[in-house]
């Protein structure tokens, strides 16, 4: 494992200088999920949540979060993103309804987009919670994790199952 690079000679936090790094195509895929009741699942599926189309709003929130990651994660560089795609898939078992969230982010630049993908996945799940909390506050936001990344000096990464 490499050493931490976000500290200066005095041991204080710094933003890493990436000006000498080569610009390459970089991608990241992050996942999250939220478990909801059958009632919420039905209301989302039939667009009956009072605040509006939950998945459309959550999708936009995820895209906005990816674009604004450097505003909330202190050491992230502002990036010109080339694309952000938020997708959903429902998984049901018994009376448990899990909304799976997958976010793909792409750029061509000097640093990766892992944090943008992770931030987007988190914000997407949080937005679903916010829009549905009037129906039930017992929703559970699941694990948020990096599934895959490509490009950059550290090479490609794929999460092992």
From Swiss-Prot:
Family: Belongs to the MoaC family.
This protein's pathway: Cofactor biosynthesis; molybdopterin biosynthesis
Biological process annotations from GO: Mo-molybdopterin cofactor biosynthetic process
Pfam annotation, one family: MoaC
Subunit text: Homohexamer; trimer of dimers.
Keyword Transferase (UniProt): no
Protein name: Cyclic pyranopterin monophosphate synthase
Biological role stated in the UniProt entry: Catalyzes the conversion of (8S)-3',8-cyclo-7,8-dihydroguanosine 5'-triphosphate to cyclic pyranopterin monophosphate (cPMP).
Domain of life of the native organism: Bacteria
Residues forming the catalytic site: 130
InterPro entries, per database record: MoaC, MoaC_bact/euk, MoaC_sf, MoCo_biosynth_MoaA/MoaC, Mopterin_CF_biosynth-C_dom
GO function terms (MF aspect): cyclic pyranopterin monophosphate synthase activity
Binding site for substrate: 75-77, 115-116
Gene, per the UniProt record: moaC
Transmembrane segments annotated in the record for this chain: none
NCBIfam families associated with the record: moaC, PRK09364.1
EC number: 4.6.1.17
Reactions accelerated catalytically: (8S)-3',8-cyclo-7,8-dihydroguanosine 5'-triphosphate = cyclic pyranopterin phosphate + diphosphate
């Amino acid at each position: 494992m490499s050493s931490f690079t976000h500290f200066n000679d005095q041991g204080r936090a710094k933003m890493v200088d990436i000006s000498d790094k080569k610009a390459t195509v970089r991608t990241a895929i992050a996942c999250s999920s939220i478990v909801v009741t059958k009632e919420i699942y039905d209301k989302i599926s039939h667009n009956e949540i009072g605040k509006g189309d939950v998945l459309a709003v959550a999708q936009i929130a995820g895209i906005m979060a990816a674009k604004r990651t450097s505003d909330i994660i202190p050491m992230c560089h502002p990036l010109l993103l080339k694309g952000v795609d938020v997708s959903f898939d429902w998984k049901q078992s018994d009376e448990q309804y899990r909304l799976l969230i997958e976010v793909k982010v792409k750029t061509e630049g000097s640093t990766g987009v892992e944090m943008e993908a992770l931030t987007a996945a988190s914000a997407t799940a949080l937005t679903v919670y916010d829009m549905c909390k009037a129906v039930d506050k017992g929703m559970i936001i699941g694990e948020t994790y990096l599934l895959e990344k490509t490009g950059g000096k550290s090479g490609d990464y794929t999460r092992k199952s």
